[in-house]
Amino acid sequence: DFCLSRGLGDVYKRQLEGLRNNQGTERIAVLRKALQDEMDKGAQVFRTHESLEHVLGVIKELRDRYMNVHVDDKGKRFNTDLLEAVELGFLLDIAEVVVYAAQNREESRGGHMRDDFPTRNDEKYMQHTMAYLTGDPHSSTPSDHIKLDWKPVVFTKNEQGELNYPPMERKY
């Protein structure tokens, strides 16, 4: 069940060759730093719908710029420059999924504090958010290529039948 689909290896080889041979002008470190700065500003523990929406817009811009990324090292062995370019693409994917999932969770809980939704909502959100990248992130809005699903929280009990870890609100 965990093997590559037929021909998928060739797809990834072409993607790597495309990155390695791209004649773009965007620097990997500049894009990575811009992503880091925007995530720190708008998607850290304290956030709002507006701050998350802004970060999603920046991620889209960075994705567009990523298509023009330049890899200095053209070698095929031990190419850390190419590795950093690949990792940047994955960082953009993960950042978008995290921000989109946070934007769709309209409550505050744990390390997710929404200033526009300051209280917990156990009735709706006592569950784990599961997010799946399902399409091409370059050609659509997050709702078109990120599928959100939920998995119930499993509560464990001790020998006396009490919850081992009862739900409680975090105070900041």
Regions found by a protein language model. Give the residues of each.
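Glycine- and aromatic-enriched mobile tails/lids
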Residues: R6-Y172
